[in-house]
Amino acid sequence: MDGEDIPDFSSLKEETAYWKELSLKYKQSFQEARDELVEFQEGSRELEAELEAQLVQAEQRNRDLQADNQRLKYEVEALKEKLEHQYAQSYKQVSVLEDDLSQTRAIKEQLHKYVRELEQANDDLERAKRATIVSLEDFEQRLNQAIERNAFLESELDEKESLLVSVQRLKDEARDLRQELAVRERQQEVTRKSAPSSPTLDCEKMDSAVQASLSLPATPVGKGTENTFPSPKAIPNGFGTSPLTPSARISALNIVGDLLRKVGALESKLAACRNFAKDQASRKSYISGNVNCGVLNGNGTKFSRSGHTSFFDKGAVNGFDPAPPPPDPGLGSSRPSSAPGMLPLSV
């Protein structure tokens, strides 16, 4: 209205009609504005009621959400505590498992070392077993040789016994011959003094007496000895068919000495064989005891191969008979404490 220019009126009627028309126009616009205002107020009231309802719903929803949020916070706190507890337990379990793993690895290493030691001990035992088998085979071979030698020596011992009987018989006969020879010599001296012209007759009588004494032995001889050794009548030197000469007596004494030396050599061989058999038996028991102890031992002890020393007859093994010791002049020859040719045998 202020901005509008008021036109110039020529008359009062025009001015009145103008202002009347303008008032009606403003009245109509006022009426429209009031209707719009009423309509706007009604719409705003409806909108306010709707917004209030929505606000109530939003507040209720907000309260519910806050309650849910608080509940979720509590749950989150509980889950955090539970997670921390689970993490602590898991850490403890992991640390325990790591310790167990380290201990298991250490035990595994120890078991590997123990297995290697057992393998080495097994190899040592196998080598010792092979060496023991070889030594046992050698021992069995030597034992068989010793048994054969022992059987041979037993046969020689039986022969020695028969020789001892014959030697004793020959000694008795030689003693009787010496006594009778002394008697004959005394008788010859007496006869020479009494009758020096008949020496041949006395010699013939003496030879006949010597032959008679030789035909009758002083000691009885067994049946087996009579079958083995010839009697004085069957000696081809002429003891039973011709007079006993001094050379024949000397040869008989030499035979007796040779027999005594053979008897001494046989006794020394027999003593060596008995010592060897005893030592080999003790050695065999010692070896079997060592083998059993080495197999049953669980701490890896090794088999000792230099713990026992025995003796064997070098002459028996090599087939060489050493020279016998000089015999005693009597019948019984002393048995040596250690036979010749004995050497230490290490196993």
From Swiss-Prot:
Region Interaction with KATNA1, annotated ranges: 195-256
Region described as Interaction with YWHAE: spans on this chain: 189-256
UniProt entry keywords in alphabetical sequence: Centromere, Chromosome, Coiled coil, Cytoplasm, Cytoskeleton, Developmental protein, Differentiation, Kinetochore, Lipoprotein, Microtubule, Neurogenesis, Palmitate, Phosphoprotein, Transport
Family: Belongs to the nudE family.
Residues modified to Phosphothreonine: 219, 245
Residue ranges of the region described as Required for localization to the centrosome and interaction with dynein, dynactin, tubulin gamma, PCM1 and PCNT: 256-291
Residue ranges of coiled coil: 28-190
Protein's recorded name: Nuclear distribution protein nudE-like 1
Subunit architecture: Self-associates. Interacts with DISC1, dynein, dynactin, tubulin gamma, KATNA1, KATNB1, microtubules, PAFAH1B1, PCM1, PCNT, and YWHAE. Interacts directly with NEFL and indirectly with NEFH. Interacts (via C-terminus) with CENPF. Interacts with ZNF365. Interacts with PLEKHM1 (via N- and C-terminus). Interacts with GTP-bound RAB9A; the interaction may lead to RAB9A-dynein motor tethering.
Interaction with CENPF: annotated segments: 175-347
UniProt modified residues of type Phosphoserine: 215, 231, 242, 346
Gene encoding the protein: NDEL1
Lipid positions (S-palmitoyl cysteine): 273
Purpose of the protein: Required for organization of the cellular microtubule array and microtubule anchoring at the centrosome. May regulate microtubule organization at least in part by targeting the microtubule severing protein KATNA1 to the centrosome. Also positively regulates the activity of the minus-end directed microtubule motor protein dynein. May enhance dynein-mediated microtubule sliding by targeting dynein to the microtubule plus ends.
Species name: Macaca fascicularis
InterPro entries for this protein: NUDE (IPR033494), NUDE_dom (IPR006964)
Residue ranges, annotated region (Interaction with NEFL): 191-347
Stretch list, region Interaction with KATNB1: 64-189
Region (Disordered) residue spans: 314-347
Spans annotated as Required for interaction with PAFAH1B1: 114-133
PTM characteristics: Phosphorylated in mitosis. Can be phosphorylated by CDK1, CDK5 and MAPK1. Phosphorylation by CDK5 promotes interaction with KATNA1 and YWHAE.
GO terms (BP aspect): cell differentiation; cell migration; centrosome localization; chromosome segregation; establishment of chromosome localization; establishment of mitotic spindle orientation; lysosome localization; microtubule nucleation
